[in-house]
From Swiss-Prot:
This is Phospho-N-acetylmuramoyl-pentapeptide-transferase. Catalyzes the initial step of the lipid cycle reactions in the biosynthesis of the cell wall peptidoglycan: transfers peptidoglycan precursor phospho-MurNAc-pentapeptide from UDP-MurNAc-pentapeptide onto the lipid carrier undecaprenyl phosphate, yielding undecaprenyl-pyrophosphoryl-MurNAc-pentapeptide, known as lipid I. Disulfide bonds: none annotated. PANTHER family: PHOSPHO-N-ACETYLMURAMOYL-PENTAPEPTIDE-TRANSFERASE, PHOSPHO-N-ACETYLMURAMOYL-PENTAPEPTIDE-TRANSFERASE HOMOLOG. Its EC number is 2.7.8.13. Keywords: Cell cycle, Cell division, Cell inner membrane, Cell membrane, Cell shape, Cell wall biogenesis/degradation, Magnesium, Membrane, Metal-binding, Peptidoglycan synthesis, Transferase, Transmembrane, Transmembrane helix. It comes from Porphyromonas gingivalis (strain ATCC 33277 / DSM 20709 / CIP 103683 / JCM 12257 / NCTC 11834 / 2561). InterPro entries: Glycosyl_transferase_4, PNAcMuramoyl-5peptid_Trfase, PNAcMuramoyl-5peptid_Trfase_CS. Its cofactor is Mg(2+). Belongs to the glycosyltransferase 4 family. MraY subfamily. GO terms for molecular function: metal ion binding; phospho-N-acetylmuramoyl-pentapeptide-transferase activity; UDP-N-acetylmuramoyl-L-alanyl-D-glutamyl-meso-2,6-diaminopimelyl-D-alanyl-D-alanine:undecaprenyl-phosphate transferase activity. The chain crosses the membrane at residues 22-42, 72-92, 99-119, 135-155, 208-228, 238-258, 278-298, 303-323, 328-348, 396-416. NCBIfam families: mraY.
Amino acid sequence: MLYYLFDYLEKLQLPGARLFHYVSFRSAVAIILALLLATVIGNRIIERLRKAQIGETIRDLGLEGQLSKKGTPTMGGLIIIISILIPTLLLARLDNVYILLMIVTTLLLGSLGFLDDYIKVFRKKKEGLHGRYKIIGQVGLGFIIGIVLYMNPAVVIKENSEVLRDGQVERVHFNKQEVKSTKTTIPFVKNNNFDYADILPFEGKTKVLFGWILFVCVAVVVVTFISNCANLTDGLDGLATGSSAIIGVVLAIFAYVSSHIEMASYLNIMFIPGAEELTIFAFAFVGATIGFLWYNAYPAQVFMGDTGSLTLGGIIAVFALIIRKEMLLPILCFVFIIEGLSVMIQVFYFKLTKRRTGEGRRIFKMTPLHHHFQKPGNAGIDAWLQKPMQAIPESKITVRFWLVGIIMAAITIATLKMR
């Protein structure tokens, strides 16, 4: 909104009005505004949640300090959502299809998570919204994102190709024509590009059509999987929040370089016109998560609940799909993914051993993975992995997972120059 106001003021030759044409300036304002909003309104929202007795119910899992969290206000994800949307609405161009997709993602998954938390708190159902309805919402969002990226004429890229001399890359050439494409960025392959349509045994228009169908299916899987993994990661104070902030910084960098033709050429990644506006959203995302961490760090004054965790995971997934970096998510979202996979592996192994031996066995002492480190070894739990033998304090687990996230974020950026 402010973009259009200052665009008008620039026509009136108001000094300084042109600043709002610079993405870097609007991004800086976005992160500061989001950070201030989260910290200022956060305290007020927490007080209202506490007065309304919207607190977390705790199931005793025998973890140190767990019962002290009982009654801590939940649904704090509202703080994150508000702190993302207000800077985005004020500073980004609202005629940009990518910004509209991110706003829809935030509102849709925020509503889904809010409904889940509402059922848990007010209807006293610990399981919350039935899992099938969560999946329907996530699959529906992934389908919408995939279809819009396919059908909207504004969603285009400029394909890149390497110019070689003596077997070495001399420069990267971008085709002048903007095209619809099912290509995505992936390291270690020619031109850092991978086309979904290339793996299909078709030719011509049929190949293009089925390439987009495959892309839509990938979008559904990515949104559903990453959103649920982020939800499972939200089990320790500050863990999901800090991890999301780290990921958000990398996504902001990717959005900026993907929309800057010289930087895209240097990194040999596809050029995506219009993606520069996503930098503003990403900085608002980072500011909101860091601001929320002010209250969510150990010992937490508020939990984000599914209102926040489902939204954070969905935002990350959709953002990556838009800038064609979904193939880098296994590295970038490593912490989220190992948390999610630990649950899947545990359930699969337990059911397999129960069917074969009549008694279910575990690989981890407890899942998601962060709980495994909270349990001491040889504590009466029949698990294949008993180490560490001493329980690790919650705050130390969180910081170590953040450090892993930072390392994986650095590796993700480095892959763009790997040939």
